Amino acid sequence: MKIAELYELYKQHPVVTTDSRKCPQGALFFALKGDSFNGNAFAAQALEQGCAYAIVDEAEYAVGDDERYILVEDVLAALQQLAHYHRKQFKIPVIQVTGTNGKTTTKELTAAVLSQKHNVLYTRGNLNNHIGVPKTLLELSPEHTIAVIETGANHPGEIKFLAEIRSEERRVGKECRSRWSPYH
């Protein structure tokens, strides 16, 4: 399925989940894989819990002729591409906050200041990775006038990749030095 087609489904069902145990009615379930789990194995459960569609990348989990299973090449890539596609529908500034320490505090303070004049979408908690950033971007709505996205990294090149997903606008680098953090 092409991203534009997946986006049409998303517009009809604008809630995304990656946890089959917490499926809001009508949500899109993205069957992500981890080191110790395969989300594809939980696709049927997600549909039973009320998800409208299950996005899977292993054909054996797309049960029978059930059209609620959407087979893609890579579930994580589909989630990231969907978020990028969705983000591009909005002509608002997106501020990226990154750094070794202090990202979450800086993001929270930036969002608080901006909320005095704007309707701000911002990363909840520290959902700042290759899964959390796309999920946050998929919360963008026409009511938002600016977004503050926290990005973290656990491997080289991840910040650049996350910036590409959200479409580069502004970047705030936050560096905090202390005796506990001699990283710079």
Where are these regions (language model features)?
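N-terminal leader/targeting and accessory segments in enzymes
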Residues: M1-Q81, Y85
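Short linear motifs at secondary-structure transitions and domain/linker junctions
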Residues: I3-L9, F29-A31, A43-E48, I70-E73, ...
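Short, structured coil segments at secondary-structure junctions
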Residues: G50, G64-D66, Q116, R166, ...
